[in-house]
UniProtKB/Swiss-Prot annotation:
Name of the gene encoding the protein in the UniProt record: spg1
Matches recorded under PANTHER family: PTHR47978
GO biological process, one term: septation initiation signaling
CDD domains the record matches: Spg1
A GO CC annotation given for this chain: mitotic spindle pole body
Cell cycle among keywords: yes
Protein name: Septum-promoting GTP-binding protein 1
Length: 198
């Protein structure tokens, strides 16, 4: 009789970035499969889990979402410690949130130097209505940051379910050192999806 027992692996993923950029929406959309228009601002830390099965292994994503207001920065260690991946998130429609990534990255790396970094641009559905030159400028800056961070870069929209599942597939591939088979998307104006081979 075949052994029916499954291996269980838990992967802690931290989500950080400025407030009101869509961190909680991404987490809820991924875990529950639906977009919540009424998502409220996170005060402190949010936490959700989602378990998926791959072959004979059950993988639980333990997702930690830090409220983006500066008064919660003292909770950053709770989100970063033991995380195997950190999603550094910004709102594609607000350039100031991309500029903040440098400081978030610096602080997070103080608590965790080994987590796989992924740079996530949210609200792609708003971004795609921007003039072409604005899209080019923001994409160029995001690529510069991703390169400096040695991070994969993904633009997503939780309200339109664009690239949400793929973010966590990239996390899996990077954490377990698997070949990422998701096709990359590189054209400005499209929902960018570029990953680096570690």
């Amino acid at each position: 009789m075949a052994d029916a027992r499954k291996n269980n692996v838990t992967i802690k993923v931290g989500m950080i970035g400025d407030s009101s950029i869509g961190k909680t929406s991404l987490m809820v959309t991924y875990v529950q499969g639906s977009f919540d228009e009424e998502s409220t601002q996170t005060l402190g830390v949010n936490f959700m889990e989602k378990t998926i099965s791959i072959r004979n292994t059950e993988i639980t994503f333990s997702i930690w979402d830090l409220g983006g207001q500066r008064e919660f920065v003292n909770m950053l260690p709770m989100v970063c410690n033991d995380a195997v991946a950190i999603l550094f998130m910004f709102d594609l429609s607000r350039k100031s949130t991309l500029n903040s990534i440098k400081e978030w990255y610096r602080q997070a790396r103080g608590f965790n130097k080994t987590a796989v970094p992924i740079l996530i641009g949210t609200k792609y559905d708003h971004f795609m209505t921007f003039p072409r030159e604005d899209q080019e400028e923001i994409t160029k800056q995001a690529r510069r940051y991703a390169k400096a961070m040695k991070a994969s870069l993904v633009f997503c929209s939780t309200s339109h379910s664009i690239n949400v599942q793929k973010i966590f597939k990239i996390v899996l591939a990077k954490v377990f050192d698997l070949k990422c088979t998701i096709p990359e998307i590189k054209n400005v104006g499209d929902p960018i999806l570029e990953y680096i081979d570690r």
